[in-house]
């Protein structure tokens, strides 16, 4: 599925009165867990954006994986530049809560990241994830290369067959390439569950294994 930002504005009923900002929100450019930069050129590393509900729990899933160099919480897929959390939660910017995952493909494969993505949430729920309801919680994969797009699309077909067998409905995950702009969330949301170990995490998978072929 290839959607333009203009199409997304219509789809999510973006409030055109929300004009956003011309400059990024302030960012402490140091990962709270591993000390690596959150924002960088990341030369020699690969990048992908995953949205699977609230980005607090989603980010923790990925920073724990060997081969993941950095992660950051942010917003993407909408029509308002540099939005705030409050604006995104209004449902009027069109953005999804996403996690930017920067990884070393010689240590962890893209297929391994996809397996974590599919198995860690319910991709059939549309504009919600568990008790978290709203367009910002939709399931998305924003690809930075055509190879990622092909692999993600193929994995969706494989996982759909497995979900069908288990009695689930159609996957609603958006897979986009090229990736829309990623806007870093406020500092308080970065690595939130490392700063607040008892904080809220509403993620929950289907219990269905994603049996895609892993390239290791």
Swiss-Prot record:
InterPro entries (alphabetical): Met_Sox_Rdtase_MsrA_dom, Met_Sox_Rdtase_MsrA_sf, MsrA_MetSO_reductase
Pfam families documented for this protein: PMSR (PF01625)
A GO molecular function held by the record: L-methionine-(S)-S-oxide reductase activity
The UniProt record lists the keyword Cell membrane: no
Reactions mediated catalytically: L-methionyl-[protein] + [thioredoxin]-disulfide + H2O = L-methionyl-(S)-S-oxide-[protein] + [thioredoxin]-dithiol; [thioredoxin]-disulfide + L-methionine + H2O = L-methionine (S)-S-oxide + [thioredoxin]-dithiol
Keywords from the named record: Oxidoreductase
EC number in record: 1.8.4.11
Superkingdom per UniProt: Bacteria
GO biological process assignments: cellular response to oxidative stress; protein modification process
Function: Has an important function as a repair enzyme for proteins that have been inactivated by oxidation. Catalyzes the reversible oxidation-reduction of methionine sulfoxide in proteins to methionine.
Name of the molecule in the record: Peptide methionine sulfoxide reductase MsrA
Species of provenance: Xylella fastidiosa (strain M12)
Gene assigned in the entry: msrA
